[in-house]
């Protein structure tokens, strides 16, 4: 039996809170430095939460889950861009690779999988650290929000050679 990741379980359980206006995207469009980009993380979920009449943990988690989805799309695009860059960076080493040298594309895939596993474990730990709190799912999904956003921003920069 496969266990679904926590963010997916949360996303399936709640209707989309609608990122109307998407404050995170608006903020990112204006951000010019890595610090400004990091400051954008959570803008849409904060706006969503500000409209909640009853800030029950499940509703708050739903707001955060919507933004996690936005960052996951960015992360997927960043992964594709980094994969393309890794393929180009491997080209000058074709001879060495044929002789057994490692490929950057293989290293990138290993890193991507390890990061996904680590992020899931890290955020599960965050939830368990608050297991007596009704807000434990909020802690877990907020962890996913920040880790996903940070990884997306890292890979976007890496794909550009920064």
UniProtKB/Swiss-Prot annotation:
Organism domain of life: Bacteria
Database matches in Pfam families: LprI
Gene3D superfamilies referenced in this protein's UniProt entry, alphabetically: 1.20.1270.180
Protein name: Uncharacterized 17.7 kDa protein in puhA 5'region
């Amino acid at each position: 039996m496969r266990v679904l990741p926590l963010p997916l379980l949360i996303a399936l359980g709640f209707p989309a809170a609608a990122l109307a206006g998407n404050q995170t995207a608006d903020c990112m469009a204006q951000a010019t430095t890595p610090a400004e980009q990091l400051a954008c993380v959570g803008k849409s979920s904060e706006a969503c939460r500000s409209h909640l009449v009853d800030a029950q943990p499940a509703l708050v988690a739903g707001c955060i889950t919507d933004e996690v989805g936005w960052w996951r799309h960015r992360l997927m695009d960043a992964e594709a861009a980094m994969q393309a860059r890794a393929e180009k960076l491997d080209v000058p080493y074709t001879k060495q690779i044929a002789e057994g040298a490692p490929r950057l594309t293989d290293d990138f895939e290993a890193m991507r999988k390890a990061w996904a596993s680590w992020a899931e474990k890290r955020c599960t730990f965050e939830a368990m650290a608050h297991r007596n709190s009704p807000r434990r799912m909020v802690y877990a999904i907020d962890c996913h929000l920040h880790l996903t956003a940070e990884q997306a921003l890292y890979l976007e920069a890496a794909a550009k050679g920064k």
